[in-house]
């Protein structure tokens, strides 16, 4: 009887130990923070094709997190259509910023929000008179480009139910379809849109105003409360310090 009780207690202890294991422990032990990033979202994460190095606000954030953890950072190339799968498959410990969505939350954990943006449409500047409002883009004769796997792909279905939706796969981007004349418009974050209209003067933001305020956070493995709490508290502390 005592042997049986001991066996049950031992099994419980082992199970508890497995459940308590956290990415925070493995990161500290390995000395490396693996970060999944797409490298195609200006100004958050961009990969320089000449140097193969990443730059952007998210990259600065991840370098700072690794520094405070006392480990090295390793950026792992990811694509929007598989960025969630990279977390669940343990290809990286954390992602750079993604939009919080219910679909992603089903399989991945989200840290505290660290950035907020609105969604805006982009069109060719020469077509601004024709496409001056959101409603003008919601038409069966209009083609809206989206990038496969992004939150904008889902939003486009909601905002433009009458339009033709044309998805492109990374490394191609939706706005490139607009530039090439293969699509009439696309939607993106107000942050990226402001960068794109400077880089490509032929593009313009539809002056109808932003919609659908969205929140950015990093993705971490679902259920890893220790790691999630660590990063979330770190974000709040850095906000307090105006990082």
Segments from the language model and where they lie:
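A conserved helix-loop-strand patch within extracytoplasmic ligand-binding domains
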Residues: 21, 71-75, 79-81, 99-104, ...
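Extended ligand-binding regions for polar small-molecule ligands
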Residues: 59-68, 127, 135, 141, ...
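Short helix-initiation/N-cap motifs at beta->coil->alpha
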Residues: 59-60, 74-85, 166-180, 212-214
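Ligand-binding cleft/hinge of the Venus flytrap
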Residues: 45-51, 62-71, 133-140, 149-168, ...
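Extracytoplasmic small-molecule ligand-binding "clamshell" domains
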Residues: 22-98, 106
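Periplasmic-binding protein-like
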Residues: 116-120, 194-236
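A structural signal for short loop-to-beta-strand junctions that line the ligand-binding cleft
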Residues: 24, 54-58, 105-117, 205-208, ...
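A ligand-binding cleft/hinge motif common to bilobed small-molecule-binding domains
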Residues: 82-85, 98-106, 154-158, 179-212
């Amino acid at each position: 009887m005592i042997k049986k009780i001991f066996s049950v207690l031992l099994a419980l202890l082992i199970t508890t130990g497995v459940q308590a294991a956290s990415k925070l422990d493995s990161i500290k032990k390995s000395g490396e923070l693996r970060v999944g990033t797409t490298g195609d979202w200006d100004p958050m994460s961009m990969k320089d094709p000449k140097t193969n190095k990443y730059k952007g606000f998210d990259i600065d954030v991840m370098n700072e997190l690794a520094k405070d953890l006392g480990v090295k950072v390793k950026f792992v190339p990811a694509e929007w259509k598989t960025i969630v799968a990279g977390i669940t498959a343990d290809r990286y410990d954390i992602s750079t910023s993604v939009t919080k969505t219910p679909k992603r939350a089903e399989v991945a954990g989200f840290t505290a929000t660290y950035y907020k943006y609105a969604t805006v449409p982009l069109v060719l500047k020469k077509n601004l008179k024709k496409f001056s409002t959101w409603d003008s883009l919601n038409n069966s004769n209009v083609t809206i480009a989206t990038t496969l796997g992004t939150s904008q792909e889902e939003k486009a279905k909601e905002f433009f139910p009458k339009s033709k939706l044309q998805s492109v796969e990374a490394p191609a981007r939706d706005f490139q379809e607009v530039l090439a004349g293969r699509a009439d418009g696309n939607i993106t974050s107000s942050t990226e849109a402001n960068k794109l209209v400077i880089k490509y003067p032929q593009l313009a933001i539809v002056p109808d105003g932003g919609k659908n305020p969205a929140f950015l956070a990093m993705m971490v493995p679902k259920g890893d409360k220790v790691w999630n709490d660590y990063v979330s508290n770190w974000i709040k502390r850095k906000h307090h310090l105006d990082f």
